[in-house]
């Protein structure tokens, strides 16, 4: 029996300063989920900050447009026959099975969770990934590549001659 697969768009790669690129990223994520055979998908609002009725509606309608206008949903296996997809899936399955066996040998997932091993591995990878962003090895348009630097506040809005305020340098762009 094939398990029921639920997919959700990620917030990890989104920027509060670049809703337009977030919309593109979430559309690609939805496409990947549908091509990958997800039974259900959920779209997070592409506006990380100050979401509104329109952004919620657009996020919802992304799924409908992809399903009915791209005809992805017509195929049982939209990626069938694609060498790249088949190859990467095989690699993923092999690495996953190896990791599964390592987890079992170490006493199982619950044991590794109790010992803090799972948390430590996630933390180490998160630091490594953040370093890739900082060094530009992993690029996010609008974040570390072609950042949106449109001012939304003036210096007069942020600072006052009458009082000393804590102000982050990036605040005028957010």
Language model: regions and residue ranges:
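Histidine/acidic-residue-rich catalytic or RNA/ligand-binding cores of hydrolases
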Residues: 51-56
């Amino acid at each position: 029996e094939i398990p029921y697969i639920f997919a959700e768009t990620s917030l990890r790669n989104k920027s509060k300063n670049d809703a337009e690129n977030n919309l593109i990223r979430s559309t690609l994520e939805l496409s990947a989920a549908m091509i990958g055979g997800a039974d259900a998908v959920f779209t997070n609002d592409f506006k990380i900050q100050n979401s509104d009725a329109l952004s919620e509606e657009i996020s919802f309608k992304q799924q409908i447009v992809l399903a009915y206008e791209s005809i992805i949903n017509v195929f049982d296996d939209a990626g069938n026959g694609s060498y790249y997809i088949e190859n990467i899936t095989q690699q993923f399955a092999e690495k996953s099975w190896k990791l599964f066996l390592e987890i079992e040998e170490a006493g199982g997932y619950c044991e590794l969770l109790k010992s803090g091993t799972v948390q430590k591995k996630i933390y180490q990878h998160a630091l490594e990934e953040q370093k890739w962003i900082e060094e530009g090895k992993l690029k996010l348009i609008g974040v570390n590549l072609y950042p949106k630097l449109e001012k939304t506040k003036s210096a007069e809005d942020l600072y006052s001659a009458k009082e000393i305020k804590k102000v982050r340098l990036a605040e005028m762009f957010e």
